[in-house]
């Protein structure tokens, strides 16, 4: 049996006090109990470091850490109302963005030199690639991914498409990033052909791959009603574009789904910082709570489904 609820304070100052251990604890509790609701959190930048001088480190995104621990995929979908018409007039059905999130490493230098990238295998064999020679200050970023993570992303997307009975679109830029994006394209094709093709065909669903720039044009011309799977930064940008065109980020659900079925619900938007600063100045603010409400109803419905609590699931439906 599980407790009625467990609470973990992911506020910036408490994360600082625990050296971010509370984020790890929250992720592990989410895996243990299967369902969680997460409130919006602050990821510090230079401005926040100045605003909160007690911060000992520019802590990483809690969302990113939780996704990494759970190996989850984020699905974002608009909340549709008859009274709010999409800016794109031909959109009739919701467009769900599936976003794969993985970490990168970046650093800066203030002197001339050269940057190389080296992989050292367990066999002792090394592969080294010259990234760039620079004659002055420069910035570098190294992006990486594990095939197991990409494969989990692909499986989550195909399974979510089957569960929600929606077509699946996937887009990268493999003509430019031939090795990196090419791996994503290959793995999605392998998973589809080997595992999901028969189920898709039985349900009358389509899997479709295209380049990211072509996908954007097709999405704008479409009527909606599909899942659009994107890599990390593509998904971050496109989910905001889709949500704004459907209404606003305040009308967007966000669900993190792990391969083992663990599910975390949250509002797609952040802490609405501008409203908070206006509140501190004594101004009146009006913040749309709809995405937060739907985060709770989603979690309550899932809890009801997992525990056979029909009344709880029905309450979530009625509240929505």
Annotated model-derived regions:
Residues 3, 119-210:
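Glycine-rich phosphate/diphosphate-binding loop of Rossmann-like nucleotide-binding domains
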Residues 3, 31-35, 84-85, 90-94, ...:
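Short coil/turn connectors at secondary-structure junctions
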Residues 4-13:
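A short beta-strand-loop structural module common to alpha/beta enzyme folds
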Residues 12-14, 219-318:
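Glycine-rich phosphate/nucleotide-binding loop
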Residues 13-126, 233, 237:
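N-terminal glycine-rich phosphate/adenylate-binding segment common to multiple enzyme folds
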Residues 15-20, 24-28, 196-225:
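A structured beta-alpha segment of the ubiquitous adenosine-cofactor-binding alpha/beta core
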Residues 21, 25, 57, 61, ...:
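Conserved active-site and cofactor/substrate-binding residues in soluble primary-metabolism enzymes
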